[in-house]
Structure formats: C-alpha cells, structure tokens
C-alpha cells in the first residue's frame, strides 16, 4: 500500500511529473462539468443525511403487548380493536464506514477523468455527512498488486482532492485487491461496513514472458478472473460487509459485472445520473 509518488518520499522526478499531469487533466475535466458534479454531490449528501435522520426516529405501532396506553383502555369489551399497547420499533442501524476501491488498470484509461469524478462525488457526499471513508485505487505491476491510498478514513474534506491523482496503467487483479481491503475493513468498529468498487468488469492480470504455465497466478483473465473476483465478493458479504459495484466499462462487459456483483451494482450512463 502506498500514498502515491506525490505525497510520499519519492526521488523519481519522471513519475512525479507524470502523476502531476494526470491530476491536472482530471481536475480540468471535473471543472468542465463542475456545476453538474456539485449538484450530484449535494443530492447524494442530502439523500444520505435524510436516511441518517430517519434512523434516529423510533416508530410506535399498536400491539397486543408492549407499553400500555391508558386512553385506549375504553376499547376493552367495546371494540373489535383490542390493541391497547404500543410496541416501539428502533430504526437505528448503527454507525457506518465506507471503503471506495477504484480499478486503476490500463483498461480504464478512456474513462479516467469520469471515474475520478465519480469517486470524488462519492467521497465528498460521505465526508460531508461525517461518515468515515477511505478511497484507494488498485492495479498490478509485475508480480505485485499495488493499492494507492488517496484518502484515509479520518482524513479531512480537503484530502478528497487527492483522488484526482488517479491514473490508469498496468493490469488489475480485482479479487486480491478486494480481499486485501476487506481484511482491513473487518477490523473497523462501525456497525455497518460498506465496500464500493468502481470497475469495468474486466479483471485481467496476464504475466508476460513466463512460458505457457496456466496456473491461476499466470492465467488471471476471462472466466477464471471473473470467478475469482465473484468468490471474494461473496466471501466479503458472508463476513457482514455490504459490497456494491459501480460499473465503469463497456456494455458488452455487463454480464461479467452481473456475475461478480449480482444485483448490487449501478451502471451510470451519464454525469447527470452519478
């Protein structure tokens, strides 16, 4: 795991300049549609806030048992409605924490600015509601899966600007990245743990120049990679983590996205629907 070349001790000037250029590019692209993005942030922020407020209220419903309501005692023997008690329903689901995981592989390059904006909108809305959230990108380099952290759970609102450092290169071993994030997310104290994965439904991590071996490590593509990712998603859900997908790929890859996330994914067709 790394914080990236700009925010860590890195002597590679070329890499710093490269990431800096991508950050400028993503920021400019966001600025072109800034009004739409700000509207989306406010809509999502307000929607989350309403949900949190509703969970603070307790509902009271008529019941045959529970707390006695004295002014309903007249019904006994006089009415068919003999419910003179009320039962309290507690809507409080507890605290929330969210991890946002972004596929940073080369196949996302054509949508790089849009994906960065999507992640930024999500992080802004969550942070404005005081919900701890972490944003990370992942891709593969040689034999390693790299997790780049743009913001941590308790980072400030300003830290969300780091998301525009997002750039796409290399391959993507989605299953391993999800597994790594889940291991840390499990240890959080919040009651509700949510993982949102922005990906194109194309897990792919081919090892070049290693002969014809077809082990999982060297043939991570197609149905094998999709199945591995789907297994990790299901394992996470079995451990009590809600996993949601945000599809950022081409329509032809939708079947793979459905196999991985089931019904729990969103397909965003335009900026208006972010």
Question: Where does each model-flagged region fall?
Answer:
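Glycine- and acidic
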Residues: 99-109, 160-167, 214
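Short secondary-structure boundary/capping segments
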Residues: 115-117, 149-154, 209-219, 259-264
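Short beta-strand-loop
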Residues: 135-161, 252-260
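VWA/integrin I-like adhesion module and closely mimicked acidic/polar interface patches used
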Residues: 202-259
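Conserved small/polar residues in nucleotide/adenosyl-binding loops
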Residues: 272-274
